[in-house]
């Protein structure tokens, strides 16, 4: 696997020099300063590429080129936004970048309720608490119809949870959910947030699938002409939330996506931390079945909690519910399969998220993207990969 690291650009507290010391060789980056929908010019792409290459690193993957909300709803200027997206892809390819991660999650990117969940060892992790989220939906946002998404027991627990919250805790929970996490391009007020949700009224899972298929059908000719691979990131968490449909959550969703848009340029990001939240997602099976479409991997683990099957926290990279040993083995199997047919390029992998620990506990960091936790994760995955290669792949 190609060892990569997500970098949020010149304002990231983790510098490119830090990343070099971590042992990564590839950078995962995006032009976050360009508003959603606008074309990324070659000038801006090359400017960022030069900064990365000056340190001896490679801009391996774009994560992400954001998909404008009007593309997802097929309203307003959606065709113009698609045309802009196509031009951005052309520009990236012509600047030598050929792998683009994106997602098709409505309104929100990845979602957590707690950004400082304390682990037994004192480090801090990200957490999604189903009851806290229910309290937000039912009693803070007061989304119409939200009751249908929760059991009577969950509703009672959510009310108790809400009644015990201080005003500061209400503000913090609201901010955690709607203010935009790292990599998300939008932040909202409560009123703006509900207005965004309302735009999806009447858009079912099947309808959102239609919109995604149309979007990809427009992009594939550009991707095929330039050899540019798209790698869709799964929903996080991988299930419907806030009354919104989710369409990249299961192996059945991947089956549909690859059958509907069969071009090999229509690929996947295997994010084990997102897919792995669901106990019914067999990650190794997913990799073995759709390995040829996997162009990017995010390796991390989550732990489902006993209090509620929908509640989870981000575990250490080799702990939790993800069988990282067999996941990495399956990825290495796919790399070997490719090498046997002449494709020796390694699959880009980044240690996704990491616990805030040690000296980083005293620093301001991007949630999930502190340096030391990811350094630990990268080292662990690197060691696992080396052991597997020595044991099973050395001829």
Swiss-Prot record:
Q: What's the stated role of this polypeptide?
A: Catalyzes the dehydration of D-mannonate.
Q: Which domain of life is it from?
A: Bacteria
Its cofactor is: Fe(2+); Mn(2+)
Keywords (alphabetical) are:
Iron, Lyase, Manganese
The record's Gene3D superfamilies line, in alphabetical order, gives: Divalent-metal-dependent TIM barrel enzymes (3.20.20.150)
BP-aspect Gene Ontology terms: D-glucuronate catabolic process
The Swiss-Prot or TrEMBL record annotates one GO molecular function as: ferrous iron binding
The protein in question is named: Mannonate dehydratase
- The EC class name is lyase
Pathway, per Swiss-Prot/TrEMBL? Carbohydrate metabolism; pentose and glucuronate interconversion
Q: Which NCBIfam families match?
A: PRK03906.1 (NF003027), uxuA (TIGR00695)
Does the entry feature the keyword Nucleotide-binding, yes or no? Answer: no
Family from the record:
Belongs to the mannonate dehydratase family.
Q: Which InterPro entries match?
A: Man_deHydtase (IPR004628), Xyl_isomerase-like_sf (IPR036237)
Query: What is the species of this protein?
Result: Vibrio vulnificus (strain YJ016)
